[in-house]
């Protein structure tokens, strides 16, 4: 007598602590083995792209902080670059260095959270406690520069909102001296840890060809052996003046992606040090009064400055009729902004290309044939944040 084997359907999330947000995965299980994984997204959809259409270019910046809210300034960077390309604005070198420095701080913020929570998902508690301590220091730097720990609203078309406060550059420099020791300590806990390796080596393997077919970017494609990094291949701001290496994996598994993130943190520290050494006094935003607000002291003394300020904050600046795509190397991968302007002070359309969206699409391919307990390990190595996936 033949027996028909029935698979079991299991809901993973949306309230599971390892789902990293509001992911709902419908898993089809044959015993402990995952036969199929069906991600259901949209539980954090806020209509960001539509909301941006009703805001001026300056008012739209905070929406980008709320996409990948682990490293907010990296998204603002893409939007600022898109406007600058259409308006053909030259950004002062000091502003470029400040922007690159804070983008690399964002990369460390994102990677340290991912590496430590991935370890937490497979049972290692200590790294996350150490990691959050370092993230606290970095968020204090964010707060001192922009006034906000998380949603910075700091980058502007033509530069940054305000200059670095007194003593911040020195404190960031001191952090760069002490942080590599923390990375070494994390590696001591995890890299040669037998349990951590058993949970990550040969799990969620992605070949070079499949990584390209699924349009992976960032660590997901570099972990599979493709040395693709927009900071090198399509440099923006002052990245071509900086020296750094691109860590590349061999096997394309969860462990290689973890190693890539660890090495990228070291490279980010090196980039921040270079930015600090190159930084000299100078303007921190475009001097065009039609785009950048005047300094506060000028508003009290000059009628022209007062008019510029009033027009900028009521009507906003007009952007020439054009369309453009700009992409930056965000911590999760290629974050792109496709901006269409119709000559008014509000975008006609702003399409956002979130890297996490492409990575989550491959969840079924990545987890098929693995055990149920491997789902959090694979999901952790994808580095998903739902602000940008659901938009």
UniProtKB/Swiss-Prot annotation:
PROSITE patterns: COMPLEX1_49K. It catalyses: a quinone + NADH + 5 H(+)(in) = a quinol + NAD(+) + 4 H(+)(out). It is a peripheral membrane protein. Its EC number is 7.1.1.-. Its main location: membrane. Keywords: Cell inner membrane, Cell membrane, Membrane, NAD, Quinone, Translocase, Transport, Ubiquinone. InterPro entries: NADH_Q_OxRdtase_suD, NADH_UbQ_OxRdtase_49kDa_CS, NDH1_su_D/H, NiFe-Hase_large. It is found in: Cell inner membrane. It comes from the Bacteria. SUPFAM superfamilies: HydB/Nqo4-like (SSF56762). GO terms for molecular function: NAD binding; NADH:ubiquinone reductase (non-electrogenic) activity; quinone binding. It is an enzyme of class 7 (translocase). The keyword Membrane applies. GO terms for cellular component: plasma membrane. Belongs to the complex I 49 kDa subunit family. HAMAP family: NDH1_NuoD. NDH-1 shuttles electrons from NADH, via FMN and iron-sulfur (Fe-S) centers, to quinones in the respiratory chain. The immediate electron acceptor for the enzyme in this species is believed to be ubiquinone. Couples the redox reaction to proton translocation (for every two electrons transferred, four hydrogen ions are translocated across the cytoplasmic membrane), and thus conserves the redox energy in a proton gradient. NDH-1 is composed of 14 different subunits. Subunits NuoB, C, D, E, F, and G constitute the peripheral sector of the complex. This is NADH-quinone oxidoreductase subunit D. The lineage of its organism: Bacteria, Pseudomonadati, Pseudomonadota, Alphaproteobacteria, Candidatus Pelagibacterales. The gene is nuoD.
């Amino acid at each position: 007598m033949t027996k028909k084997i029935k698979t079991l359907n299991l809901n993973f999330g949306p309230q599971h602590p390892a789902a990293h947000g509001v992911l709902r995965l419908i898993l089809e299980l044959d015993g402990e083995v995952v036969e199929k994984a069906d991600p259901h997204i949209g539980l954090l959809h806020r209509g960001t792209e539509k909301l941006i259409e009703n805001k001026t270019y300056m008012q739209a910046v905070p929406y980008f902080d709320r996409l990948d809210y682990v490293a907010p300034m990296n998204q603002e960077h893409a939007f600022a670059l898109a406007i600058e390309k259409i308006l053909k604005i030259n950004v002062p070198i000091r502003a470029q260095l400040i922007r690159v420095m804070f983008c690399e701080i964002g990369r460390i913020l994102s990677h340290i959270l991912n590496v430590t929570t991935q370890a937490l998902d497979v049972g290692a508690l200590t790294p996350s406690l150490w990691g959050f301590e370092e993230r606290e220091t970095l968020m204090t730097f964010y707060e001192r520069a922009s006034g906000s720990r998380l949603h910075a609203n700091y980058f502007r078309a033509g530069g940054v909102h305000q200059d670095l406060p007194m003593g911040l550059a020195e404190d960031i420099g001191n952090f760069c001296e002490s942080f590599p020791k923390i990375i070494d300590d994390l590696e001591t806990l995890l890299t040669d840890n037998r349990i951590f390796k058993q949970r990550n080596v040969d799990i969620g393997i992605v070949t070079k060809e499949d990584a390209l077919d699924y349009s992976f970017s960032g660590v997901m494609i570099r972990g599979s052996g493709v040395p693709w990094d927009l900071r090198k291949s399509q440099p923006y701001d002052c990245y071509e003046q900086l020296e750094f290496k691109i860590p590349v994996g061999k096997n394309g598994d969860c462990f290689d992606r973890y190693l890539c993130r660890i090495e990228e943190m070291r490279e980010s520290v090196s980039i921040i040090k270079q930015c600090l050494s190159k930084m000299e006094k100078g303007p921190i935003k475009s001097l065009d009064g039609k785009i950048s607000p005047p300094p506060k002291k000028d508003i009290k003394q000059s009628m022209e400055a007062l008019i510029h300020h009033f027009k900028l904050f009521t009507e906003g600046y007009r952007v020439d009729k054009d369309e453009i795509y700009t992409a930056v190397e965000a911590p999760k991968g290629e974050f792109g902004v496709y901006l269409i302007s119709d000559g008014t002070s509000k975008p006609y359309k702003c399409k956002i290309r979130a890297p996490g969206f492409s990575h989550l699409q491959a969840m079924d391919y990545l987890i098929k044939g693995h055990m149920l307990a491997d789902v959090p390990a694979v999901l952790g190595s994808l580095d998903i944040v739902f602000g940008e996936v659901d938009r």
